C-alpha cells in the first residue's frame, strides 16, 4: 500500500508545475522571458496581458513559474496578487481591492506611524488612503456590502474586529462618498506618491460561469485608468469568447477581448514527440516500480509502437497526466492478468479518442460471444459496428493511428486497408488464440475483460483453471477427481447457451497442449476413452437432438495424442493399444477409430491426405485389428441395443471387422418383431431443414446395406405399425419411415 501511494503525485492527480526542476516542456525559459517583460511595462497606465491556451495545455504551470520569477526579480514596491475567482467563489472586485487596501494601509503605517490618540486606535481605524480604495471597490462592485464586512476580510491587522465593532456605518460612507472619477484620481495619486506597483494574476478564467467572466472583465475595465496595475489573465480563448458573447449578449466576443486585453501570448503547443516520449518514459518507469524490473526488449518494442502511433494524438500535458494516472490506478491490481503495452494502448485511446475506447469495449464484448459460439450478429449489427469504427478513426490526426491495419495489430478480427474493404469479426487461427492467451493480450478471449473491468470474462475460464486441470490429469491417483470435475461441467451453465464442458473443449487448443508434459496429456486422453459415452448420454438428456460429432472431442484427443507422440511415440502407441481394449467408452472409441482407419483408406475409401494421419498405416492396422476383436465379443454386442443411436457404430464395426459380421448380428436381433422395431428405432438419423426444422428419418440408403432383404423388412414394418395402439417410440419410427426424402 505504501509503494502504491508513492506512485501518485503527492501534490494532486493533476497538479501543475511549481518549480523549474519539475518543468518538462521548456516553460521555464518562457516564464523567465515573460516575467522580465512584465516588469518593464510602462507604469503610467494599467496593463492587461493575456496568456492563452487550451484546457490542460499547461497555463497554470507556466503561471506558477512566472510568479516564481517575479518573486525573485521584482523590487520591494511591487506587490503580486494571485487571485483565483474559480476557487474562492467570491466577488473578484473584493478579491482585488481588499488586498490593495491592506497594502496601502500597511505602507502608510510604515511611512507615517500614528501618534497620540491615533496610535492608541490604529488597530480600529482605516487610513484615509485605504478607505478610498474601499469606497472605490464599493462603487465598482456589482453588489454593495457593508464596510465592516470588507474590513473583516481584507486585513489581518484589523480582522479581529469583523465580528463585533462597526467603525464605519453605511451612513458614514454615504456622507463622505466621492464620485468614482475623483476617487480613481486620488487613488492613482496615492499609488504614485507611495511608489506602489501591483501585478494582479487571475487564473482559470475559462472555468467560470459566463456571468462571472463578465464580472472579471468589468473589474479589469474599472482599473484600466489606474496606473501601476498590470493584470495577467489566463484563459482558453475559445471558451472565454463564447462566455462573453453569452453573458453580454454580443455577437463578436473576440473583438470585445481585443478592447480589454492589450497584449496576448498564446501558449506554444508542446512538440508531439515530447509528449509521447514523456508518456513512454513515465510508463516504463511505472512498470519498473511495480514489477521491480525493467520491461523486456519485446515489451519495450511494443510500448514504443503504441506510443509512436497512438501517443501522437496527445495534445496537452494534462492528457499525459490522465493516461498515466489511469495506469497507476489500474495496473497494480491487474498486472498478473494483462499485457502492459496493451493497457497503455487502451488508456491512450481513452484519453485521446473516447469514442474509439467505447467502441473497442463493445466490439470485444460481442466478439467474445461469437468466438465462444454463444451467439452471432446479424448483418445489420455488423454494419453498425463497421460504421462506428470508421467514424472513430476519422478523428485521429496522425496518419498511422487512423489505419485499420495498424489497429488490427492490437484488436483482433479487423481486416481491410480502407473504408470500402473494412471487415470485422474475422475468424482467427487456433495458434493465434493460444499466443494471445499466453501473452495475456487484449485480443485474448480469456483476458480482454480484465482491461475494462478489473475482472475476468464471465464466459471464459481463467488460465489458472487449465493449469490445475492438466496438473490433476498428470497424477494417476487423481483420475477419479478429474472425471468428477469434468463431468460436473456438463450440468453447469457457463455462458449464454453452452456449458463449461463445451468451453473447456474449445480451449484445449494445440498451443495450450504443447505446453504440457506427457503424463498430463495422457491423463486427459484416459478421461475421454473412459467417459465420452457418458458425456454423450448426459448431453442427449439435455438435448434430444444432440450430436457428439459437433463437440470436437475427436479433434481434442488427436491434438493430445499428436503432442504425446512428439514427446514419446512408443509410450503413446502402447497407451493406445491398452485404451482401445479397456476404455469404458467403446461406442465413442469406435467412432474415433473409424477416423483413424479412413486416414489410410483402410475402409476402401479415398485417402484425403496421408501426411495428416495421426499414426502410420502399420500402427493403425494393428490398432484396428485389436479393437475389431473387442467389437466382435458377445459382451459388447449385448450392449448395443442399450444405445439410443447405432447407425454410426454399425458402420465403424463394418469398416473394422466386416460387413458380413455386422449383418449376422442384425439377423440375430431381428428374428423377433420386437427386436426389429428396437433396432430400427436406433437406426434413425436426425435432419435439420430450413423449412421443416428438426426431424428424424430412416435413411433407406444408409440402413438397407445391413439387411438381407430390405423391401421385405419395410413390408413387415408397415403391417406391424399399422395398428392403432402404438407406443410413442413406435409412432416415432412410423413417422421416421415416412420422412425418408
From Swiss-Prot:
Residues 27-334 form the KAP NTPase domain. Coiled coil: none annotated. Keywords: Plasmid. InterPro entries: KAP_P-loop (IPR011646), NTPase_KAP_P-loop (IPR052754), P-loop_NTPase (IPR027417). Transmembrane segments: none annotated. Responsible for the exclusion of phage T7 by plasmid F. Growth of bacteriophage T7 is inhibited in cells of E.coli that carries the plasmid F. This is Phage T7 exclusion protein. It comes from Escherichia coli (strain K12). The gene is pifA.
